């Protein structure tokens, strides 16, 4: 087992070899080092690999009960794993007294588990009766800081969101599927006839509900009641929890797009009173975790290829609604792996560490 570097707290990264885990390890190298030990944990098939963490080679441990040995109060385990893995193994960490930060859906609906975006509701981290703090999905995280700031200024009454989601949200399988499909259609004239892209891509569309190259797929998640997708309903529920608006009307349409990294969202937000777009821009410019890129005359607005690899959510295209003086239209982009997951997890873990500093 990797020895502690100092007397500081332990940070265990569960799922260290996955897509988000890789981003989180890079992120740790550029943030303040508050950890005495960074412990890497992954599935047994990844055990024994050595990964660089803050310039040091660290061996990956297999996810077993023993992986959390020596952890206790003041230590944190970050889970970047599927929901079933988090549900199975998070109690092994909390049983030792450590806190858990989980980025999966396993605990997001549990009223005993706070759902936290540090820029919006950091104070909720302290109220964790199960010893667990959940992070939202990457779509909710992308818009949370902007919505939180605007809600504090104007009072949010209604929200309509369309998300345009990157392939990497489905992990490495999503990225690899999109790259494979692009290779099959690159240099062709496909896309002008019914079925030509489907024939080129074949029946294996990876984790997506249809071919993604040269296409968009208006579906993410499983089927829920009324024709909604499970992810659309999850985003609605998470937004309500984070903003503490349990009755907020929220309508979400999730669309899968052929982008590798970076979610985009088109939002229409209605508030308690009239909204001035100029003042709203100032509010967002002052909001933590948000950068405003909003000069269409100069060709400056958020795009996923620009937001990829950056910490903040990018907001732009701010417009007062033409039909409702109380509504604001705007566009947000954020790196789904970094801003939408790894950064949220690290910031939350740092908040927990600060309680014991």
Predicted segment positions?
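Charged docking surfaces used in two-component/phosphorelay signaling
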Residues: 77, 169-357
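N-terminal Rossmann-like NAD(P) cofactor-binding subdomain of oxidoreductases
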Residues: 1-206, 247-249, 313-314, 318-324, ...
